[in-house]
Amino acid sequence: MKAENRIPRRRVLGLGVALAGLCAGCAVLPAGSTESAAGSQAASGGQAAGRVEKAPLEEIHNVHLRDNPELYEVYDDSGVVTMYLTVSRGNDSENTDHSWAEINHYSTYDYEAMGVPRYQVNALLQVGDENGPLPGELGYGVEAPNATVQIRGQSSSRNIQKNYKVKLKKNKGSWRGQRTIALNKHMGEGLRFRNKMAYDLIRGIDQMMGLRTQFVHLYVKDLTDRASGVFEDYGLYTQVEQLNKTALKAHGLNPEAQLYKVNFFEFYRYEGAIKLTSDPTYDQSSFESYLEIKGSSDHSKLIEMLEKLNDESQPMEKLLETYFDVENIAYWMAFQLLTGNADTQSRNVYLYSPQNSSVWYLLDWDNDGMLRRRERELIGFTDNESWERGISNYWGNVLFRRCLQTARYREALDAAVRELHDYLNADRIEEMTAHYRSITEQYIWQLPDVLQLPVTKPQYDVIAAALPEEIEENYQQYPEGYRSPMPFHIGVPSLQNGTLQLSWDPSYDFDAEDITYTVELARDYQFRQVLYREEYVVLPMTQTAAPGAGQYFIRVRATNASGYTQDAFDYYVIDTGKVYSVKCFYILPDGTVVEDLYEE
């Protein structure tokens, strides 16, 4: 982005620049020299040098996160890059003796069920234009494979159109300084440009760190089960820089840092999984079900932070000073709130902590869920509504809950929301949308992408035009979030002496208003066959006569003295989305109560 389109920078001179300025024209004394400052002054005629202005000395624990803006000026990422991928079989030792059909058949969940690592194939990656590979670009004139390729992603790995991770082999070159090329189809996202839009926006936000992105037109030639072939059109992808040690170094961060990709993590202690590698019971797969290790394997700093954070006797003001950067969390959260990127309360974010620092920072990751309210309305899918809108979306996360309960953090978040609201103005979003449409619509309305696009052309036009409006709606929703009670969890009912015991966690109100609950029990999730209903319940529990064996639904809502109502965290999943504030359970013939669970 142009400089005038950025949020004004509040930059501190780098240490190297400061030292260079101080040392210019100065004699450097050799180690162990006995020449004194006074002697040096005498040698210069007794005239004392003028006092120089120095940048104040900073502590490592007080450093704000800043990206390397010059990194984005090296390459033009505003258009489309054409990539050619020739895949072939490799060998058993490197897990590459597989077919391209196998790569595209199995999901991440299939590999977990089979207990095997993800299959790979050998690949030759070449970069060029629509006429073919170009001189001077990666892979030009090369015939032997220079990479491996496998599927990437979790839930997206079940899609017909896969995401791919292309990993260039050592000493086989790199593309824009990157050896891992992540290609994302964003198949469930109707516009196909939201993730790139997010990272392009983040470039202009000093308080956040982004990643390099590029639209890619991919062609694949499959030689895994045949001797010859042609390049087939795989449509439009978005390349997103892989967040690893190489990326940390490129962005001016510490490559020896602790870096975790959050798979599912709400900042609880998780004693059974989050352990030191020296612990005899340490299991990496269990650990990585919560946090995928991308940096240092020394987890002691992480454990120390989690133990302090989960000790409610520890003042959050002090913890924010010691273990977190308020600015970083506030701007990260403000961006997610304004863009409606709700699937960030327990995943789709990285944790980063520099070596020799106790501070943890949030790094943005995966934004294809942003600004999708209008799209979900048009396709008739219910998600990211109810408590998932606004600050209540983050209430189930220990870190975010304790932040929101702290006045200093709320003030910082208020300021960040206001500043980013001005930055994410309608003119900017409309201009960016027009640019992305001019690129992506060349590809998405033709094969192969048009077959899997979840929206029609008229719907696409409506969705794209509504993006600025969604930001404004989210901005207006933000202060409303503090007026409502916070969401809470419904407990699993229990049978005791012929009665059904119903319970839930207490709700929280920022103004400490009285809260009452409405409790309902029904045979259906639409609550047309209600068996029990009670309003103005004061305590987080009640009971009713035990029904017979069968499937049941409990719904609990909290209302404060001002009349604002909030749903419970629980929801029941149907084909068209979520039914909020509802828990499904079964009473078995032997009297056992079983909660209805499912995989997201």
What residue ranges belong to the model's regions?
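Conserved NTP-binding catalytic cores of kinases and kinase-like/nucleotidyltransferase enzymes
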Residues: 39-197
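Middle-to-C-terminal accessory/interaction subdomains
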Residues: 59-61, 93, 159, 295-303, ...
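Predominantly extracellular/luminal cell-surface or secreted proteins
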Residues: 128, 520-524, 555-559
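Internal "kinase-insert"/substrate-recognition segments embedded within catalytic cores
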Residues: 170-172, 208-211, 227-334, 342
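Beta-strand-rich modules
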Residues: 546-565
